């Protein structure tokens, strides 16, 4: 079953948007080869992506993304000094140390294509992958993994944890980054199987 009579048009628009984002430097560099591979497949195209990140964020209260402020954001492993530098910028609200796994949204031409992509992603370690949206206009697969950390570090300019604790959470976060970067490599190595 073909969900979108407009698949080719939607793919063309998504590729134009990606090209603009690439020129502006808005795409995580380490995920670009995977995006290019997915977009080279006849029945798929990417609509958005993040290669996973570690961040330090200040927000009035947890979940208030509208008024949140990045104090540090990295799409790679980080040093304790980088995290401490970000923490020093904290002034008000809650201070959070966060890890988020990679996330990709991929348009699929048919339900069978979407199922094949979800199964491949899960087999590569992206256990939270699913069909995110089905309508007569689009069919979107979300590729997502399990790595995540939400650690309260401080509030209203006061740091609640010591350096030893920070060192440990940075160590754990970096291990998660290594794990999800390996999953991205695995997915990139196996994505061509969808062309068969």
Curated annotation (Swiss-Prot):
Give the Pfam families listed for this entry. Answer: TYW3 (PF02676)
- Provide this UniProt record's keywords sorted from A to Z: Methyltransferase, S-adenosyl-L-methionine, Transferase, tRNA processing
SUPFAM superfamilies attached here?
Answer: SSo0622-like
Its EC number(s): 2.1.1.282
Domain of life according to the entry: Archaea
Q: What class of enzyme is it?
A: transferase
Write out the catalysed reaction: 4-demethyl-7-[(3S)-3-amino-3-carboxypropyl]wyosine(37) in tRNA(Phe) + S-adenosyl-L-methionine = 7-[(3S)-3-amino-3-carboxypropyl]wyosine(37) in tRNA(Phe) + S-adenosyl-L-homocysteine + H(+)
Q: Name one GO molecular function term.
A: tRNA methyltransferase activity
GO annotation terms (biological process)? tRNA methylation; wybutosine biosynthetic process
PANTHER family (UniProt xref) = TRNA WYBUTOSINE-SYNTHESIZING PROTEIN 3
| Family of the protein in this entry | Belongs to the TYW3 family.
Q: What does this protein do?
A: S-adenosyl-L-methionine-dependent methyltransferase that acts as a component of the wyosine derivatives biosynthesis pathway.
What name does this protein carry? tRNA(Phe) 7-((3-amino-3-carboxypropyl)-4-demethylwyosine(37)-N(4))-methyltransferase 1
Gene encoding it? taw3-1
């Amino acid at each position: 079953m073909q969900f979108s009579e407009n698949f080719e048009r939607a793919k063309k628009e998504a590729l134009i948007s990606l090209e603009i984002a690439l020129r502006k430097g808005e795409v995580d560099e380490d995920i670009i080869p995977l995006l290019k591979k997915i977009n080279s497949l006849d029945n798929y195209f990417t609509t958005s992506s993040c290669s996973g990140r570690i961040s330090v964020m200040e927000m009035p209260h947890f979940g208030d993304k509208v008024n949140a402020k990045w104090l540090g954001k990295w799409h790679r492993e980080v040093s304790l000094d980088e995290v401490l530098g970000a923490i020093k910028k904290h002034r008000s609200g809650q201070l959070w140390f966060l890890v988020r796994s990679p996330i990709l949204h991929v348009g699929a031409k048919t339900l069978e294509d979407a199922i094949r992509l979800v199964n491949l992603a899960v087999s590569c370690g992206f256990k939270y992958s699913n069909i995110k949206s089905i309508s007569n206009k689009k069919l979107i697969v979300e590729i997502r993994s399990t790595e995540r950390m939400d650690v309260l570090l401080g509030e209203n300019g006061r740091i609640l944890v010591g350096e030893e604790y920070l060192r440990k959470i940075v160590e754990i976060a970096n291990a998660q980054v290594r794990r999800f970067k390996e999953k991205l490599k695995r997915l990139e190595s196996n994505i061509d199987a969808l062309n068969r």
